[in-house]
Design a protein with these regions (language model features):
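Phosphate- and other anionic-substrate recognition elements at nucleic-acid/protein interfaces
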Residues: 24, 29-42, 47-49, 73, ...
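Phosphate-interacting basic helix/loop segments used at nucleotide- and nucleic-acid interfaces
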Residues: 73-87, 191-192, 199-204
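Short glycine-rich phosphate-binding loop at a beta-alpha junction
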Residues: 88-101, 175, 184
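N-terminal phosphate-binding loop and adjacent alpha-helix
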Residues: 37, 44-85, 241-242
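Internal amphipathic helical hairpin motif
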Residues: 72-73, 98-158
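Solvent-exposed alpha-helical segments within well-ordered globular domains of core cellular machineries
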Residues: 77-84, 120, 124-128, 169, ...
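Small-residue (GG/TT-enriched) beta-loop-alpha framework at ligand/catalytic clefts
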Residues: 2-24, 42-43, 47-50, 152-242
Length: 242
């Protein structure tokens, strides 16, 4: 396995090991006599996933903390121990999937423009919430457009996601202290928007996607290939189990 996906809920961690699968394995055929063939950057990669491991995070684990976000080193140790339990101690690269309720988020509308301009708009929307402290946040955005229309003044909806830079730095340092590399922090909603644009067939119809796991309930609506609505709620799984 090459990577571990880490999802964080209030009382649980969900970790899943994964790896990219070679062309021969993905196609189910051997690539004999063609070992020097260059990879096609447009070719869709295939992945193999382990069974998820659910790690309880209770008061005994947190001690005087209210969540693992307050102790990145604890989060890293739990992931490290989880990989050992899964017999995947060889994994070093970590992808952290963050739910929107743990981020500062804001939807906004804009017309098509240069990437740097749209990024500036995203920062402005976050500034509406955090004021001048916006410079202390790392901000990314994901637009809902499929870029299949060419209207210059078409109004597009985007969503900005922000995390304190200091927290991101502490997370990197925390994982590094356990010989793990935090290579990416991804908002789960951004991943869902991307997936809907690429994989959900919604042309000439409206499609609703509802996902519930230990981390969140995610509601997503797409129409004619364009995402219309995306929102996350705290998962009720823990309350159901109680």
């Amino acid at each position: 396995m090459n990577y571990v996906l880490v999802q964080i809920a209030k009382r649980y961690l969900c970790i899943t090991a994964c790896e990219t699968v070679g062309e021969a394995a993905a196609n189910g055929t051997a690539n004999k006599g063609n070992s020097k063939k260059q990879a096609d950057p447009n070719e869709k990669k295939a992945y193999s996933f382990s069974s998820p491991l659910i790690i309880p995070v209770d008061k005994a684990v947190l001690k005087d903390k209210s969540s693992v976000w307050e102790d990145p080193a604890l989060l890293a140790r739990l992931v490290k121990d989880g990989l050992s339990t899964m017999n995947h101690s060889e994994v070093r690269d970590v992808i952290l999937m963050v739910e929107s309720y743990d981020l500062t988020c804001q939807e906004y509308q804009h017309i098509r423009g240069a990437k740097r301009i749209i990024e500036g708009l995203a920062i402005d929307r976050i500034r509406d919430f955090v004021g001048e402290a916006a410079s202390d946040f790392s901000v990314i955005y994901k637009d809902y457009s499929t870029y299949k229309t060419k209207e210059v003044n078409e109004e597009i909806t985007s969503k900005a996601f922000a995390m304190p830079k200091a927290l991101a730095d502490d997370l990197v340092a925390g994982f590094k202290s356990f010989s793990l590399n935090l290579i990416q922090i991804i908002p789960s909603e951004a991943a869902m928007i991307y997936a809907a644009q690429k994989t959900i067939y919604s042309f000439n119809k409206t499609v609703a996607l509802i996902s519930m796991d230990y981390s969140a309930v995610r509601v997503f609506i797409a129409k004619n290939g364009v995402p219309l609505y995306c929102h996350e709620f705290t998962s009720p799984v823990d309350e159901i189990l109680q």
